[in-house]
Amino acid sequence: MAQTPLRIGIAGPVGSGKTALLEALCKALRQKYQLAVVTNDIYTQEDAQFLVRAEALTPDRILGVETGGCPHTAIREDASLNLAAIADLEARFMPLDMVFLESGGDNLAATFSPELVDLTLYVIDVAAGDKIPRKGGPGITKSDLLVINKIDLAPMVGADLGIMDRDAKKMRGEKPFVFTNLKTATGLSTVVDFVEHYLPTKVLAS
């Protein structure tokens, strides 16, 4: 019986803090679990290289996928590139506990294919304005955890965190969300706890 790793997708608009969250999660979890990462960029491996430079994990545990087109397709309609990258990492490091998949920068409509990930974390940032949660879209309404990042910028951009809290509750119903400032690790422990909560539920696959 071989353990199948928990696959966690991280999506969100360009500049929202996806890679920063991924770095923080890797550093918080790497002493307890066997981790690997797959990043998606259209023509480069910039995010993968950033994580290597940040020493989030050893370089051989971080694979960059160059989608060569719309990054949404590689995480939704045709996930073959990402599935191949996961298979490569599993072959090298099995048993893995978690594999993180970071999408390319996207809009509010991007979603991961259910065959690709078990959980989705969707990252938005306060600097985009307090109207973002009520704009909706699958990332806002259907992600397993909504991460509202860069709360330290709220006073500078005139964003009201109270409004964002109200609208996130309205749009998500019972689904959880968290306010974060990844520079100071504010809210990070909530994200870590959320991810860890799902580990025991992964079934063993033959």
Swiss-Prot record:
Query: In which residues is GTP bound?
Result: 12-19
Its annotated compartments are: Cytoplasm
Q: Name one Pfam family in it.
A: cobW
Q: Which GO terms describe its molecular function?
A: GTP binding; GTPase activity; nickel cation binding
SUPFAM superfamilies in the record, alphabetically?
P-loop containing nucleoside triphosphate hydrolases
Q: Does the keyword Transcription apply?
A: no
Under the heading InterPro entries, the entry gives: CobW/HypB/UreG_nucleotide-bd (IPR003495), P-loop_NTPase (IPR027417), UreG (IPR004400)
Cellular compartments per GO CC:
cytoplasm
CDD domains linked: UreG
Listed A to Z, the keywords are: Chaperone, Cytoplasm, GTP-binding, Nickel insertion, Nucleotide-binding
Tell me which Gene Ontology terms the entry assigns under biological process: urea catabolic process
The entry's family comment says:
Belongs to the SIMIBI class G3E GTPase family. UreG subfamily.
Q: How does it assemble?
A: Homodimer. UreD, UreF and UreG form a complex that acts as a GTP-hydrolysis-dependent molecular chaperone, activating the urease apoprotein by helping to assemble the nickel containing metallocenter of UreC. The UreE protein probably delivers the nickel.
PANTHER family referenced in this protein's UniProt entry, alphabetically: UREASE ACCESSORY PROTEIN G
Q: What does this protein do?
A: Facilitates the functional incorporation of the urease nickel metallocenter. This process requires GTP hydrolysis, probably effectuated by UreG.
Q: What is this protein called?
A: Urease accessory protein UreG
From what organism does this protein derive? Synechocystis sp. (strain ATCC 27184 / PCC 6803 / Kazusa)
Question: Which gene is annotated as encoding this protein in its UniProt record?
Answer: ureG
